[in-house]
Design a protein with these regions (language model features):
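Generic alpha-helical structural signal
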Residues: 62, 143, 203-206
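SAM cofactor-binding core of SAM-dependent methyltransferases
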Residues: 20, 24-92
């Protein structure tokens, strides 16, 4: 499935690596949803809950689920232009939810890089077609992607609560939680999100997850804080591409042993 949202820290390029490490489960929870790369790359679970504290995210996916044709029409009639990009930043919660969702897509797809903290990174355009060619193509293909995304969201619960509230509610052994919080600020170059997390916030999150009965996988960059608080957890690393930082090493911590398959051993022989 193609991405419907460009979002900082999205996992589209490494979603396959993460999905391969998801154990069998009954209920799926993703409390820091963002663009939902892992969710859209895996098979549906019996029960699924997606959540994000940034109200633009759940508003977008509710609009896609509830009336994809309406949102697709708004996007289809929104030109790829500097004026639309600048205007979209004036969007607010008093506006129609569907127009607000379209404005959110505009700021994320038509800008250089992607931020959700209100910072304007500049309208993406190019004289030689190096960037504008694929940027324009992606924008004008977006209505079709919206319609495809809607089908996957049909039976999904969508919430807009602090992550810890949701995590505590889903504290059951047959639940799998994929935790992809804003990474520790010391491991990246700049603030990117509307709702960032301090080191104290990360400590509180890890404290709750350590005591959870659910199966948990956490994504992050190499971190002494995470290593010290998650002693005894299974840890794996693989290469990923950061937005501006080139190649980075992605780390996942799991409170369960990974279930290897024949495919894993076949891939190992290739290297």
């Amino acid at each position: 499935m193609k991405p419907v949202l460009k979002y900082p820290g999205s996992k589209w390029r490494i979603a396959g690596e993460i999905v391969a490490r998801i154990p069998e489960h009954h209920t799926y929870l993703e409390p820091f949803f963002g663009s939902g790369a892992v969710f859209f790359s895996k098979e549906p679970s019996r029960i699924e809950m997606i959540n994000d504290l940034d109200n633009n995210v759940p508003n977008l996916f509710r609009c896609i689920r509830d009336d994809p044709d309406r949102l697709a029409r708004i996007v289809a009639t929104t030109p790829y232009s500097r004026h639309e990009y600048e205007r979209a930043f004036t969007s607010n919660e008093e506006q129609d939810n569907f127009q607000r969702a379209a404005d959110f897509l505009t700021t994320c797809w038509q800008g250089h890089g992607f931020r959700t903290n209100g910072y304007r990174v500049g309208w993406k355009n190019d004289v030689h077609g190096r960037e504008s060619m694929y940027a324009l193509r992606n924008w004008y293909n977006l209505p079709e992607v919206i319609l495809e995304t809607a089908e996957r969201l049909r039976c999904v619960q969508i919430d807009n609560r602090p992550a810890l509230e949701i995590i505590k509610r889903f504290n059951y052994p047959d639940v799998f939680m994929y935790i992809d919080p804003p990474y520790i600020l010391g491991t990246r170059k700049a603030k990117q999100y509307k709702h960032e997390m301090t080191d104290a916030d990360h400590e509180e999150l890890l404290g709750v997850l350590k005591n959870s009965e659910a199966m948990v996988m956490i994504s992050g960059y190499e971190s002494e804080l995470y290593d010290s608080m998650l002693k005894g957890w299974h840890k794996e690393q693989f290469r990923s591409n950061a937005e501006y930082g080139g190649n980075r090493v992605e780390t996942v911590w799991m409170n369960y042993e990974r279930q290897f398959t024949i495919k894993d051993f076949q891939q190992e022989k290739l290297f």
